Amino acid sequence: MKKRMTALLLSACMCAGLAGCGTNTPGNNPGHTKTDSSVTSLTDNITVTSVKTDITSFDQLKNGINEFSMNMYSALPADENIFYSSYSISSALSMLDVGANGATKKELENALGITDLDEWNAEMKTYLSKDWSQNTFVNTANSVWMNKDTSWSADIEKDFLTPAKDYYSGEVYEADFNGQPDKVVQNVNNWVSTNTNKMIPEILKEIPGGTVMMLINAVYFEGKWDTPFTEDKTFQSSFYGTDKESVVDMMHLYGEHFTYMDNGEIKGITLPYDGDNVVMKVFMPTADDGDINELFDKLSNEEKQKLIDSLDNANNVEIDTLQLPKFTDEQSIDGLDEILQNMGIRSAYSDSADFSKIADGIAVSSVNHRAKVIVDENGTKAAAETDIMVKETAMMPSEETYNFIVDKPFVYVIEDQSTGMILFMGRVNSL
């Protein structure tokens, strides 16, 4: 049995609810995003009886997201710059999983690394409410956009919208996809821009044909270096990319101490941000003529993770000269679908997709991802968004000193060391 969305609205209007919002962070709380009259927010009308979670470990979330990150890395082109947030993609897919059943749900959870769904959702919810410092923080926001002319499951509020709000702080909007598509596009773009601090101002130019629902995750990270670079020590120098040599702005630090490792093939360094245990880890070949792509790509997922983790127990040494390029990288992946299907998420795209907690006869049409990073003397700003389009189906200390000169291709991750979770991962082949 299905009811029109107006029935949900009527039911929702009789409920007193909690406000849905993005993660609270100092000086940057997205909260409810302003929309115009063409969009109706249902968030406050969805009642959540929140149960306090007693989470002391984020092991399942960390293991799942980090494994997903390694799979993404291997699936993306090896000869290009890449930058993405597995945390963002996993968050969006996890919200989709709330509405899934049967084989569709099993495939999503296998790909995400979910072994205990209740624990996974509790870890997600707890991480979303994490307190951050003024200088280093992560903002996460989720939203559900529903076409007002679509018939939804009679129990969509109980089965999907309420847990999406409870576990993922999901904001819920009803909009006229068919009658006012341009205004819907404007509101969606405004929501993403607001929740990425304007780093990603636009994700849509039009609503893809047949779309009845959009699930969107937005992540914004800002971190100030614990040991900042200074502009007077930034000067132009060569970066020897895979395809060309280019002259770029290189930042320098001299005689500072950092955690450093070298296994004979790959060397790495940890660059901490101020407070909250978030760090950037950078990896390069040890040999001057080494190739980070060849060395890193030959490692299994487990070996990649061990390499990243090895910096946690490495020595803190004096780095005689640290040289890091000042750079901006922006990546857009319009269509993660083949990658996700290769990870085992197949039925979600087919006529046999089971999202019956949302509606019968709907399937995923596309999953898209955009990410941007800015690295400068003060620190790092990074943002990412993941959007899932749902359509109707045919159915419906050391004495030794070291140098770390980043003047050739490198791999880097932004990691929350309090959980061990990789928030962003990237590779720079050329600048």
Regions found by a protein language model. Name each.
Residues 5-177, 428:
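Detector for small/aliphatic-rich hydrophobic stretches
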Residues 8, 33-46, 361, 367-369, ...:
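Non-catalytic interaction/Regulatory regions outside core domains
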Residues 33-38, 79-80, 117, 121-286, ...:
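Non-catalytic, conformational "gating/processing" segments within enzyme and secreted inhibitor domains
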Residues 86-90, 209-213, 419:
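Short alpha-helical patches at coil-to-helix transitions and adjacent helical residues
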Residues 102-108, 289-292, 331-333, 383, ...:
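Extracytoplasmic/secreted cell-surface and envelope-processing proteins
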Residues 215, 265-283, 397-431:
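Extended hydrophobic
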